[in-house]
Amino acid sequence: MLSLPPWGLWPLGPVGIGLWLRFCNRGARRWRDRLEVAAAFWLGAYLLGLFWMTELTVPGWIAAVPVETLIMALPLSLVPASGRWRALGVPAALVLGEAVRWQVPFGGVPMSNLALGQVSGPWLGTAVLAGPLGVIALVGVGAVIVERLCAREWCAVSWPAVAAIAVPIAALAWPATTVDATVTAAVVQAGGELGTNVDTPQRSVRLRHLDATNAWQGSIDLMVWSESSTSADGPLEASDNLAELEALAGWRDTVLIANFYERAVDAERFRNATVAINPETGLADRYDKSHLVPFGEYVPLRSVVEPFADLSLISREAIAGEGPGVLATSLGDIAVVTSYEVYFSELVRDGVQAGGRIVANPTLASSYSTSVVPSQSLASARLRAVETGRWVLQASTTGYTAVVSPDGEVTHRSELREAIVLAGEVELRSGNTPALALGSWPLIVAAAVVLAWCVSTARKRRTRAEG
């Protein structure tokens, strides 16, 4: 897990799995043995890799770790211990396992996935072809190379090595998306301490955003505030805070993207709403966050969990929105994903395919006291930028706030806790990438077919041996 941000030692991803394949998995001939050694490997990985969850919910961490372990261990247990199909089976198993992790439990827990560990390595660019699962497949190819080098199977290294080199070269050769316009954009970080809960007074957060914005001098076409940067008691359309933001957008002559904590009329629930405000006409559009954070914005199985956990920080549950994350503005359509949604490539894809020419990501990581979650959120933004061929503007309350180019380069980045406005020229783009056009399903289906073939081949070999 040291390949993951904030450590970012990307070679340890394929090297760690490759060493496990060579010295733990390779001799396991029976399916049960392979399942046991795979489960032991991933249990250790997720006990550490998902430990950040304990700051949000210890019961959630206890529930998630064994489920995540089993999800990754099961596909790897189907990979034969030897034979020519092993080299394809390992990448396929990793792809299939991670694809399932994006769906279950609790609607998916894609944090600490293998692709995040490669954003500082040479395979980041391949996300333009096949998204994060394509990057994960190359981690599997790299692991096979390490395994065969350790076994001194020199000749068997050739085709995996060709794949590991050729795919990134093909990604570099792919034409870029079309630049439609260049604008000056700013992302605002209000600042503050880490490790504060979600009930930090909304007024103080809003005032810190206003102070940072007012202190910034210069012309801005587009400005993005962080998640929960303001609030409303009841419908935000009638709130004083919206009127204040409309006045601010008009005064700065900028399109303003801000996020509201909107309490429902019954005060028992809330909506996480991101709005677009035009300088001339005021409120232009809104998007209500559709993929909610389990144990953060709602409690799965609340009646079961409540006797064993303090749920006072989640006294209100969020109401999920519907539809793609895209906001219509005077600059054109802007794709938006709120906070945790940036980890889900399909959500960003939906917003971009609905017309988004740039991606805005208001986020909030102040509930966590370390840099693990902020750095993984930034890594996710880098992956989403490459996949979509779009600039990504990530605005976090306490960091990291960043501007990311379509090749995954972080052109501007804040430090944690500081109050700052980051500004620069960005491009509004159109056009498709292969990852946008195809989505994740072709690679998932291919991985499933390869694993099914591995199982079938192993069964035939066993039948011949017994006969």
Locate each region found by the language model.
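Membrane-embedded alpha-helical bundles of multi-pass enzymes
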Residues: 1-173, 370, 381-384, 396-401, ...
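Cytoplasmic C-terminal tails of single-pass
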Residues: 464-467
